[in-house]
Amino acid sequence: PYPYSVGGERIWDEETPCMDPWVVIPAMAAVTTRIRFFSNVLKLAIREPILVAKTVGSAAVLSGDRVALGVGLSWMPEEFRSLHQDMRTRGARVDEAIAVLR
């Protein structure tokens, strides 16, 4: 069960539109000058760090460096299984990814 709803159901289903923030942030930045943008939590444990660095770096350039990146480990075993990754190594992978991003 999903722990963040009263009945244990997921709040969003697979049909709920969800835009990629790294596409939307440069679009919003193009029409603003003072707003800063934050990704909330990017599940870094299931992402490729070089691609994250390139994507976030591009958004930072296009926004005039008005971007902040929040990262997390991800707690859902299904995500790791679907990507054929070992959930038990997520902490070490995130540590390494943060080193790459810096």
Task: List each language-model region with its residue ranges.
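N-terminal glycine-rich cofactor-binding segment that shapes the pocket for flavin-like pterin cofactors
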Residues: P1-R102
